[in-house]
Amino acid sequence: GRLSGTQFTPEKGWDENKLEFFRRHIVQLGRSGLFVVYDELAGKEPVEWNYLLHTVELPMEVGKEEGGLRILGKNKADGISIAHLYSSQEMTYAQTDTFFVAALDWKKRLGKALANHYHFTATTTPCNKVFFLNIIDVHGNNRADAVINHQGNRITVEGWVIECNLDSEGKAFLHIENTQNGASLDFNYNSNKGATTIVDQVGGKRIEKRLVDSLPKPEI
């Protein structure tokens, strides 16, 4: 930093890493336009956890629903994205139409000012550990919004049953099943040692695979 003039301070983004664990599970539910994002987060001390979502053209419409938040995003081409956000901790939320740091075309390549985007932030109460579940419904103007039914750790939507830990205690788990087409996903530390088992029907055949984390090889 001496030659470049970089200041290694918390205000400049340099500080002790207080994140102890992070794992994200992303699942596409067939071709339904539904996606499941399940996050496990743990810190070395109680902190407020933030969950961010963004839109480019139009502001989001945010409201509370059973056990969580409903965040509706649209664009000017009739694209719709609805995030159904749940957490193991209570959440407050806010939305702004300005960047945390102003976007500058410092190379002068665009020839125009950069428009502000819209930024949603959900914030939890201070805690060491948190689970987030986000069920995202993406579609155009060709169908109605998917209907979400939420009861505790169980959610049903369009023939899919989603179960996960949304309590403040216990280990993370994620189980997704569609009884109509036989597809399923199971992630569980206790019964599956942290591996993920997926079952699907491909070309009329039942396919089962076991997925585990694969760490990248170091470059040096």
Map each language-model feature to its residues.
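CBM-like, beta-strand-rich accessory domains located in the C-terminal region of large
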Residues: 1-220
